[in-house]
Amino acid sequence: MGNKRFRSDNNAGKPTSVEATRIWATKVIEDFRASGNEVYTFEHNLSNNERGVIHQMCRKMGIQSKSSGRGEQRRLSIFKSRHKNGNKNEANEKSNKEKLKCVSFPPGADVILQELFTHYPPCDGDTAATSFTKYSGNKGKQGQWKDDFFRKPQISSEEILEKVASLSSRLKKDKALKEITKLRSKLPITSFKDAITSAVESNQVILISGETGCGKTTQVPQYLLDHMWSSKRETCKIVCTQPRRISAMSVSERISCERGESIGENIGYKVRLQSKGGRHSSVVFCTNGILLRVLVGKGSVSSVSDITHIIVDEIHERDCYSDFMLAIIRDLLPSNPHLRLILMSATLDAERFSGYFGGCPVVRVPGFTYPVRTLYLEDVLSILKSGGDNHLSSTNLSISDHKLDLTDEDKLALDEAIILAWTNDEFDALLDLVSSRGSHEIYNYQHQSTWLTPLMVFAGKGRISDVCMLLSFGADWSLKSKDGMTALELAEAENQLEAAQIIREHADNSQSNSQQGQQLLDKYMATINPEQVDVSLIQQLMRKICGDSEDGAILVFLPGWDDINKTRQRLLENPFFADSAKFDIICLHSMVPAGEQKKVFNRPPPGCRKIVLATNIAESAVTIDDVVYVIDSGRMKEKSYDPYNNVSTLQSSWVSKANAKQRQGRAGRCQPGICYHLYSRLRAASMPDFKVPEIKRMPVEELCLQVKILDPNCKTNDFLQKLLDPPVDQSIANALSILQDIGALTPQEELTELGEKFGHLPVHPLISKMLFFAVLVNCLDPALTLACAADYKEPFTMPMSPVERQKAAAAKLELASLCGGDSDHLAVVAAFECWKNAKGRGLSAEFCSQYFVSPSAMKMLDQMRSQLESELKRHGIIPNDISSCSQNSRDPGILRAVLAVGLYPMVGRLCPAFGNNRRTIVETASGAKVRVHSLSNNFNLSSKKYDESLLVFDEITRGDGGMHIRNCTVARDLPLLLISTEIAVAPTGSSDSDDSNEEEEDDEEVAANTNEEVAANTNEEGMDIHKEESRRGAKMMSSPENSVKLVVDRWLPFRTTALEVAQMYILRERLMASILFKVTHPREHLPPHLGASMHAIAGILSYDGHAGLSCPPESMVPKHSRTEMYDTGGWEEKPNSFLNSLFWSLSLKENKHPSHTNRNQQHNYNMAPTEAASIPRQQNYKQRNPKATNNTDSGKKKEKMFVNPTNRINQPEAASTGKPSKHKSANSSGSSNKKENMPSDQAYGNKQHNTVPREAAAPMAKNQSSKKTKTRSGNNSDSGKKKEQYIPKRQREDKAEQK
């Protein structure tokens, strides 16, 4: 399969023009990517320019390309990721040659580990709790949350009659309601009211297809409610879903207004964080995600028992939730005959949805917009070349490309009018249809029997003025009748010579204009990159529009923020547009503050023209009612997902025909308008009909987990194949792999207890695991912020001017420095913390303005945090009093570890900088080199001389400029060693190991060629290999001081000792056991040995975090508790006093540094009160080192859980004075001075990287703990003799000095 080549017939029809070549090559590459082949080779008839174009397109699409051969034999081949399967082996080979980075526990951790393993030594029972537990299905059913919002109202028939009478009375008496009712009656959907209610009564599923503005969204729910109340006198629960929360809220408010009610009475809504109404509301609007959680959370039996109607609006948007929801509802319909499903769409894709539901009836409702003239790139170039000609003359404006869907009645009327005109010379009816309802569909309509068109009739009858009118309207003279005659031939046959001459001249001019336009197009395409927006062309076109007209807003559709900003800057640099009194330039983008966005709805004063620069948000989400001119770049930035390379993509791509139609319609809302498409007619014809459904361009981990929660016995792939457009198999495989890595699914794809808990939290499964970890290490508060920020938009605003943008970047750096710097994620944590404290002081507006923070985003994060906190309390994961759950929220090591858990496995290694290149390059697990985005705080990270530091990041995004990561954070090595999927050990690089590697590779090659021989000797040779691996592994781990290579997830190599590998392995096992215990017993305290282990892990992470801050910023230690002044040289951003006062306000109240929290105050919820004594604290700190001090404002000495590494002392090998643990093995002290080899029959991992076995790790960790605590005793059976405690020399000296 790997070398299989893909051939197609596409080369045979290779076009010659530049534009056609791009379209053809795109089709070939997309077909290849969708195929199962690895290589595709183009034919030899490609020019150098064509090969260059294909190379460029391949880079953008994540496909490798290579040209080979010379002359006529030169070929271009394209490949799918060739290094995909080999990258980890390549990384291993590379690590053998390079100097390994050393990783070890931080100074001070030895004392913590000694105490832990002394009282809770490793044993086989530690790892028993880490095995996956299959979800039984009982706990979830018992703990289901009942939401009355979606239950049917409890009202009697008499009460229904009262509601109907009250509504009728309001509509008759209230003047405002009378006016509203009058407007409602003029909506196109009004005449379809009876047809809709009748179809709903007769069919379980119907589809309403109506153009934007026909009234379906606001009127259909009212039609159904009135029908149930007035005609049937029955209660109902009508649930209407919208893809966006703002739509759900605004539509429900509009309907309440139309009925003269307050929102929340009979009409309500429920969106994330907000709701109005309740069970008493008969109509409820919600987002698709809300209804999906209802369907999944309650189970198929009870989820729709009280719902009578489900209206799914805007199904043409194809968001993943709606597609997934429709698949669930389709399965529920047969067992719920009372349920009615109403689908509503604004596009022509109705047939697919109708077929998906067994051919359900379709009600088509026409819309109303003014005619819109459509021009393409050829026309725009000709207009700009023509110079002084006014392209907006009244004649040209009347030309319309407005697409009209002809009904059967329209066709019948046209047939009759054509026959009357041709046979009886009665032209009034035909002229009336042509002039009053002008569109290309009418101008070029062909009689169903004779195929005659209106132009043929007028030409054959010699009506010269009517022929000229139709030709000016764009009627097609080349259409043929059933006899095979065109309008020109028909005029000549009827001896209408003047009409024939007019048509002939028009045809010649059209051909000449067409040739001229094509020449202009070819010349233009040869000089620009069509994949990018031509800002200069947009500026010239806008100047032409403004010169030929005096009023009318201009709406420009652009792909993204960069293009919006470039266009705005270009316009402001032009003196013609720089006058703010004449032009009001407004940007419409999610990064623009809400106050600025609202200006788009205001009409400008007389003499001022409004120019709106927008993304596709202006296609349907908002309506700007004074737009007359639309400039469509034809491009849009859409987030997608490449499952083959496992990267997200955010690229500028061509829109679909449906998108282009929506953009065109924006020009005809208030009066006839013009749409300028800045792409050719050929490109327009090649566009897809509809955009790719979201479920095909996103990772599907959450959906796969929801499938298993919905039906634990169902195969994920089997259910997802029921969707209208299932995700590709590779996406599903990637999702299942991640869910298995984090323990949500077993290797057999069974739902685990951990996965069941993850699935019921309203965050991504990876974020759920982070929350559990944060609770265990008492770092909940920042974890809540990180979890909610990952599910919401960027909280920082992007100013327009370059100077302000530099200030915004500096502000973000300053915020990040509060948490240690080198992070985009921690900048959000700091921003929220400062905003929350500023809000309490009444300074939130000042803070948001000074640090370019979006107030609305902060408010939303605050609400999302509250909701997530409530969910965690409801599931018992955190207590009602969470004051003790965030005591380590300011500790840099623990905070970054929490972040690493939430972002794993998105880990990269920083590449060293070369020469003068200051850009940060990161190597990922796949071997790819990606850049850090220019908007990231870590854009210039390489200049800080980091030595192969690790970064964790949200996602890899492939954009127009290549692959990059946007939000990332520098991470320490130790947290990733604790949370990674796999760690494996091998001897450090030597000639022997290299030779053995080569031999193994040769063996693998021989095995590949002689499968039958190997199969015959599998048993005997397998036993020999197993023994050899065991012998080598035992030798490698036989001594604690042995240097070994530690490989994380088969690609990140480190150098460490055998002892530290063993200790790390035990900590990993106990960490996973703690998480699983917390999942299965959320309201119980951790067992003593797990609670002690989490204490140890938190302490080690704290030490590790401080060890990584060799020159910490001033903000890391507040002034009121600073024990010494640090040299902050080298830190680029220092928080000012205003920011420091906001961030450290909590610490000011407590008068202590967060990392100095007393150890026995930690984990009050996760551990029993007596557990705090199970690990002896680092007592008598000054006794161990009389030079150490701990100064505070109060002057009191405090015991520390975590010692500040910058004030670190040499730790003695102190013996613990705590009581022996019941977990301690009987022979741990008696044989502690023996070196205990690993079992010789232990099986290891692959040939090069031996996975650390618990049988090896446990004895080594246990022996080392017992070595450091020796007891000189006589016969253990002699209980009458007192044991003498061995005290190291340094500790004896300390005690003597104290005396």
UniProtKB/Swiss-Prot annotation:
<dbReference type="Pfam" id="PF01424">
    <property type="entry name" value="R3H"/>
</dbReference>
<dbReference type="InterPro" id="IPR011545">
    <property type="entry name" value="DEAD/DEAH_box_helicase_dom"/>
</dbReference>
<comment type="function">
    <text>May function as an ATP-dependent RNA/DNA helicase.</text>
</comment>
<feature type="compositionally biased region" description="Low complexity">
    <location>
        <begin position="1007"/>
        <end position="1020"/>
    </location>
</feature>
<dbReference type="InterPro" id="IPR014001">
    <property type="entry name" value="Helicase_ATP-bd"/>
</dbReference>
<feature type="compositionally biased region" description="Basic and acidic residues">
    <location>
        <begin position="1023"/>
        <end position="1032"/>
    </location>
</feature>
<dbReference type="GO" id="GO:0005524">
    <property type="term" value="F:ATP binding"/>
</dbReference>
<keyword id="KW-0067">ATP-binding</keyword>
<dbReference type="InterPro" id="IPR001650">
    <property type="entry name" value="Helicase_C-like"/>
</dbReference>
<dbReference type="InterPro" id="IPR036867">
    <property type="entry name" value="R3H_dom_sf"/>
</dbReference>
<feature type="short sequence motif" description="Bipartite nuclear localization signal">
    <location>
        <begin position="1182"/>
        <end position="1200"/>
    </location>
</feature>
<feature type="compositionally biased region" description="Polar residues">
    <location>
        <begin position="1204"/>
        <end position="1214"/>
    </location>
</feature>
<dbReference type="GO" id="GO:0003723">
    <property type="term" value="F:RNA binding"/>
</dbReference>
<feature type="region of interest" description="Disordered">
    <location>
        <begin position="987"/>
        <end position="1039"/>
    </location>
</feature>
<keyword id="KW-0547">Nucleotide-binding</keyword>
<dbReference type="Pfam" id="PF07717">
    <property type="entry name" value="OB_NTP_bind"/>
</dbReference>
<keyword id="KW-0539">Nucleus</keyword>
<comment type="similarity">
    <text>Belongs to the DExH box helicase family.</text>
</comment>
<keyword id="KW-0347">Helicase</keyword>
<dbReference type="GO" id="GO:0003724">
    <property type="term" value="F:RNA helicase activity"/>
</dbReference>
<feature type="domain" description="R3H">
    <location>
        <begin position="15"/>
        <end position="82"/>
    </location>
</feature>
<dbReference type="InterPro" id="IPR001374">
    <property type="entry name" value="R3H_dom"/>
</dbReference>
<dbReference type="InterPro" id="IPR048333">
    <property type="entry name" value="HA2_WH"/>
</dbReference>
<dbReference type="GO" id="GO:0005634">
    <property type="term" value="C:nucleus"/>
</dbReference>
<dbReference type="Pfam" id="PF00271">
    <property type="entry name" value="Helicase_C"/>
</dbReference>
<dbReference type="Pfam" id="PF00270">
    <property type="entry name" value="DEAD"/>
</dbReference>
<dbReference type="InterPro" id="IPR034083">
    <property type="entry name" value="R3H_DEXH_helicase"/>
</dbReference>
<feature type="compositionally biased region" description="Acidic residues">
    <location>
        <begin position="992"/>
        <end position="1006"/>
    </location>
</feature>
<keyword id="KW-0378">Hydrolase</keyword>
<dbReference type="InterPro" id="IPR011709">
    <property type="entry name" value="DEAD-box_helicase_OB_fold"/>
</dbReference>
<feature type="region of interest" description="Disordered">
    <location>
        <begin position="1175"/>
        <end position="1299"/>
    </location>
</feature>
<keyword id="KW-0694">RNA-binding</keyword>
<dbReference type="Pfam" id="PF21010">
    <property type="entry name" value="HA2_C"/>
</dbReference>
<feature type="short sequence motif" description="DEIH box">
    <location>
        <begin position="313"/>
        <end position="316"/>
    </location>
</feature>
<feature type="binding site">
    <location>
        <begin position="210"/>
        <end position="217"/>
    </location>
    <ligand>
        <name>ATP</name>
    </ligand>
</feature>
<feature type="compositionally biased region" description="Polar residues">
    <location>
        <begin position="1176"/>
        <end position="1193"/>
    </location>
</feature>
<dbReference type="InterPro" id="IPR027417">
    <property type="entry name" value="P-loop_NTPase"/>
</dbReference>
<dbReference type="InterPro" id="IPR007502">
    <property type="entry name" value="Helicase-assoc_dom"/>
</dbReference>
<protein>
    <recommendedName>
        <fullName>DExH-box ATP-dependent RNA helicase DExH6</fullName>
        <ecNumber>3.6.4.13</ecNumber>
        <ecNumber>3.6.4.12</ecNumber>
    </recommendedName>
</protein>
<dbReference type="GO" id="GO:0016887">
    <property type="term" value="F:ATP hydrolysis activity"/>
</dbReference>
<dbReference type="GO" id="GO:0004386">
    <property type="term" value="F:helicase activity"/>
</dbReference>
<feature type="compositionally biased region" description="Polar residues">
    <location>
        <begin position="1239"/>
        <end position="1251"/>
    </location>
</feature>
